[in-house]
Amino acid sequence: MLPFTLQQLRILKAVATEKNFTKAAELLYLSQPSLSKQIKTLEKNLDILLVNRENNKISLTENGKIFLQYSERILALCEESCRALIDLKNGERGSLTVGASQTIGTYLMPRVLALFAQNYPQIDLKVQVNSTRIVAKNILNREIDIAVVGGEIPLDLKKNLTVEKFVEDEFSLIIPKSHPFANKKIVTKEDLYHLNFISLNSNSTIRKFIDNILIQNQIDTKQLKIIMQLNSIEAIKTAVSLGQGAAFVSSAAIEKEIELKTIEILKIENIRITRTLSIISNSESYKSKAFEFFSNELKKLKNEIEN
């Protein structure tokens, strides 16, 4: 007989999240005394202290943190097994959680999500947009079923993921319509030193990626004039449209601006800044029919983009 129940694992997870017995009890629709009793019973059965209760502050012990990791995996597997059975019973019904890194989730993913929702309205679709690392981690935790990411996948996570090449994402150099370079179409590396740049902050993975490509092409990024650092692609595009400077932006993010003709795009002589977008999933998790349907929609989008 196991020394714990699924309900006790849910309780431990809620306590870890809320860091408060009363709030955790409310989350699970339990009384606070009942929740406290379940935690004590779990600790007694495991013969390990899981929760610190010092100075009215609730936190997990180191043993509690380790046990929580396994608890979350057990709960995720239980939920996955139920989904598999429902899948067999209901055919094209079910649920799917899709993940995406920031730029993809904002500009590329909505197209496929809209088509998927239209074609499979009976499937409950949820979306998580976050950094590539967090999305990959949530794939492994079975909180996300499938995702499209653009950043480099950390090696410690990548080994347990199925990674499939999706499409190439090119970064365009955009400038205001009023800029003297607007009629050039192609600029040299030397021309870059005469531009005022608007960029993401230096800790951004996209900023680091672009800088690395420029450095590989013998461009001294420290000599580029960065007049403004903003924390969103939308803010950067707006600033460029208003004539405040130039920027490197994913081509997927500027379709509207191209259509409205609010910016100009410049090519850099003999340089292309591209990255590979990847479709990732958990190598060991159950692949539902909803998963298969969504994978097919991604393949359709890939063919549309490449052709």
Curated annotation (Swiss-Prot):
One of its GO terms (cellular component) is chloroplast. It is found in: Plastid, Chloroplast. Keywords: Chloroplast, DNA-binding, Plastid, Transcription, Transcription regulation. InterPro entries: LysR_subst-bd, Tscrpt_reg_HTH_LysR, WH-like_DNA-bd_sf, WH_DNA-bd_sf. Residues 21-40 bind DNA. Residues 4-61 form the HTH lysR-type domain. Transmembrane segments: none annotated. One of its GO terms (molecular function) is transcription cis-regulatory region binding. CDD domains: PBP2_CysL_like. Pfam families: HTH_1, LysR_substrate. The keyword Plastid applies. Trans-acting transcriptional regulator of RuBisCO genes (rbcL and rbcS) expression. PANTHER family: HTH-TYPE TRANSCRIPTIONAL REGULATOR, HTH-TYPE TRANSCRIPTIONAL REGULATOR CYSL. Belongs to the LysR transcriptional regulatory family. This is Probable RuBisCO transcriptional regulator. It comes from Phaeodactylum tricornutum (strain CCAP 1055/1). The gene is rbcR.
